[in-house]
Amino acid sequence: MDDDLKKKTQETANRLFGKGIKMAPSYLTWKEFDRDLANEFSLFITGRLYSRTVLTLPERQMVACAMLAALRATDELRLHVNAALNVGCDAKKLAEVFFQLATYAGMPAVNEALHVFRDVLKERGEWPIK
């Protein structure tokens, strides 16, 4: 395995998820079925894709949160809302990202995203948004 890629993957993961990473349940599930494939996905997604510099990590996380909210993928959304806040996304802007979904993903998706967002903010001691 390329040591530079492995190092970049770990550094990016630490920025997104903090030390003592709580991996997404989907990653753990993949790992149960095929450890090598799960690791390859991790290297590609975190080490290569998330390490690109065209978008900042906060911008990437806002995109990820919007997509996950539209898909109503709440477990992954919870993980990426935390990551967004970890890399400096403004909570008011992230709320606005979720409001914008109403037109394209519908109110149920917005409501679900806001519930996840509020729960994460409460867990972090950052609720209500100031």
PLM region spans:
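Alpha-helical transition-metal enzyme core signature, strongest for iron centers
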Residues: 6, 70, 101-105
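Acidic, glycine/proline-rich low-complexity segments that act as flexible tails and inter-domain linkers
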Residues: 1-57, 112-130
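N-terminal alpha-helical segment
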Residues: 42, 59-60, 77, 94
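Short, solvent-exposed interaction modules
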Residues: 68-71, 86
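C-terminal binding/interaction regions
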Residues: 85, 89-130
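Short, structured motif recognition centered on aromatic/hydrophobic residues
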Residues: 60-68, 98
